[in-house]
Structure formats: C-alpha cells, structure tokens
C-alpha cells in the first residue's frame, strides 16, 4: 500500500543515457541523479509535457550504480524527457553523463518506483 499522496509504478523499464551537449527538456544542464521520462504524447496523450512532472523525485526499489564516483543511488529527479520506443509507459532513462560503456552495459532493467503527488 502506498502512502496517501503517493503513486507506485511497478515493473517498469529503465535504461541509461549519455550527455548530448544539450540542456535537459526542463532547461537545466544534466547532472548525475536525474532521469528522463516519456512525454504525454508518447503514451497516447497530447503535448510535450512529461508523464511525471519535472522536479518529481522517484524512489526506486533497487539501488542503481552511477558512474564518476557517485556510486549507488535509489532516488532520481525527473528533469528530462526522452523517447523510449517499445518501453513501458512509465519507463525511466537514468542519466549516465559521458560514460557510454556503462550506459550500454546497464541495458534494460525492470524496476518499480514511488513518488509523491
């Protein structure tokens, strides 16, 4: 049971992405600890706004290793949008900075997460 005012998304795809040289869809320079989510139009809605609002903190059910000495984290802030073709509706794409090898090795990991509304 989720606490009042929280949402849990179970068994969602997660992937990792790398720095492109651009700011996030929210207008910030990307930092380790952020993630991207689908835009509403990617899952049958309309518009470019994210399916989970920017600034929302997602708490994952497993620790995820991040590169560059960050280590393991289970909390990620939504600050970007992306396209995850053939991924679950509430897929998350975790920012891995410039460590392309680590992002590729991450692959697709199923996880669940909770966030406050």
UniProtKB/Swiss-Prot annotation:
Picking any one GO biological process from the record gives:
killing of cells of another organism
Where is the organism placed in the taxonomic lineage, from the top? Answer: Bacteria, Bacillati, Bacillota, Bacilli, Bacillales
Protein name stated in the entry: B-enzyme
- The answer on whether this UniProt entry bears the keyword Transmembrane reads no
Print the keywords alphabetically.
Answer: Antimicrobial, Bacteriolytic enzyme, Glycosidase, Hydrolase
Q: Indicate the residues that form the catalytic site.
A: 89
Q: Name one GO molecular function term.
A: lysozyme activity
The EC number on file is: 3.2.1.17
